Amino acid sequence: MNLLDPILLESKPLLFLSFLTAIVSAVHRHGSLLRASIASSGNDHRLGGNEAPPAIISVYLGEGLEKLLEAVENQREYTYIAESMRDLQIPTLPHLLLDTLDRNRTSPFVFTGNKFEFRSVGASAHPGKAVTVLNAIVANL
């Protein structure tokens, strides 16, 4: 079972929201540790320069999940829709599925459908240190 699959919102919404908010909270509280886990001279030069993502660790959830969390915070009703359809008003063409993901890659920590991507690890670096730190900061909550 993927605990970060938004399909859980239908059957087990508290389970999904618990894991999602735990990860977001951990990155918010311990972003500096996560940033230190990917630090190297080459990566520090790359991040925030002429290339995305920036050196500041931020989380991008997408518009749908952002609205859902705001509704939970404000105790309002909200129905999460994972994807949207666009009708081009051309009878011979099907409806298009709109992508709500971060395509321009401007955030270093992104929710992409049913998982998080940490995009700040350098190409030549081993992701093990960052994954270990991420697991530790989430477990620390």
PLM segments and residue spans:
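Active-site capping/gating regions of soluble enzymes
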Residues: M1-L141
